A protein has these predicted regions:
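Short glycine-/acidic-enriched loop or helix-start segments at secondary-structure transitions
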Residues: 14-16, 39, 76-78
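Surface-exposed, flexible loop/turn segments at secondary-structure boundaries
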Residues: 10, 35, 74
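Short, structured active-site "lid" loops
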Residues: 43-73
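Short, glycine/charged-enriched secondary-structure capping and boundary segments
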Residues: 18-20, 44, 80-82
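Short, low-complexity, polar/charged sequence segments that are solvent-exposed and flexible
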Residues: 23-24, 46-51, 85-86
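Thiol-based oxidoreductase modules, predominantly thioredoxin-like and allied folds used
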Residues: 26-48
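Non-catalytic, surface beta->alpha helical segment in thiol-disulfide oxidoreductase systems
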Residues: 67-88
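Local sequence-structure signature of Cys/Sec-based thiol-disulfide redox active-site neighborhoods
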Residues: 1-32
């Protein structure tokens, strides 16, 4: 199962959530704003994984982020079999 960390108020996260909401056991969406436990899990990953270096340098949050089935962390929806939001 692929874990996805995000927030309802994030447009990119909402786009991802819409893709997975009916996919059953393939994905687990973790809303980091729902509980401090979820936020702490996200912050531990963000503070300790170099994949977030550019996000932090640019003032970006770093969501949605994906924990793939092999444990790899990614910020790329395509790595999780999903589509990225297209900016117009």
């Amino acid at each position: 199962m692929i874990k996805i960390y995000g927030m309802k108020t994030c447009p990119d996260c909402s786009y991802i959530y819409d893709q997975i909401k009916d996919k059953g056991n393939e994905y687990e969406y973790i809303e980091i704003g729902d509980h401090v436990k979820n936020l702490k899990e996200f912050l531990i990953a963000r503070d300790n994984n170099p994949i977030f270096t550019d996000c932090k340098a640019n003032g970006s949050v770093g969501i949605p982020y994906f924990v793939l089935e092999d444990g790899k962390i990614s910020l790329n929806p395509e790595d999780a079999g999903l589509k990225s939001r297209i900016w117009i």
